[in-house]
């Protein structure tokens, strides 16, 4: 996977990846709960157990899952702010492991000769550098998983497990 770090400032994370698929295919992968359940996660790290999406401005989304390191449950949820298929999606992000912090994720999908340039900007980490670092590491993994799913059909079940130290 060729994820480029555009910037990793204290307040925001920006990454991009080129995917060899059209923007509508990528947009489906990041909005269709049945597809997200298939690719978002990796054995040994965490796995999603339920995704819900109401993809419209003001609509809600949520992901429930389990950490493979310690078996603890997690939830990430938010509200869609902008929805312009298949080129733009933005939503709030509230993660159970980050306390009450509400951040914003913006996906931009730009058609290219080779498929789609995906840009992800996750902002709102002012005063929380550890949270920014953790989310940066997470987004690098997530974009790789999504790219592998869209380009090759790789799923959580078919992806090799990793060994993560238990807490």
Label the model's feature ranges.
Residues 72-77, 101:
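Short coil-to-beta-strand transition motifs
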């Amino acid at each position: 996977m060729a994820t480029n770090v555009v910037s990793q400032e204290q307040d925001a994370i920006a990454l991009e990846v080129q995917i060899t698929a059209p923007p509508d295919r990528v947009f489906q992968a990041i909005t269709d709960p049945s597809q997200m359940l298939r690719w978002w996660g990796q054995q040994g790290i965490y796995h999603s157990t339920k995704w819900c999406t109401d993809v419209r401005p003001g609509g809600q989304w949520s992901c429930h899952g389990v950490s493979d390191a310690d078996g603890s449950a997690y939830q990430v949820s938010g509200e869609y702010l902008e929805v312009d298929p298949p080129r733009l999606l933005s939503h709030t992000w509230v993660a159970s492991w980050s306390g009450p912090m509400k951040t914003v994720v913006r996906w931009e999908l730009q058609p290219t000769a080779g498929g789609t340039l995906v840009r992800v900007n996750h902002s709102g980490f002012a005063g929380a550098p550890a949270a920014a670092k953790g989310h940066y590491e997470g987004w690098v993994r997530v974009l790789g998983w999504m790219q592998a799913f869209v380009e090759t059909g790789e799923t959580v079940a078919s992806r090799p497990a990793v060994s993560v130290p238990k807490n």
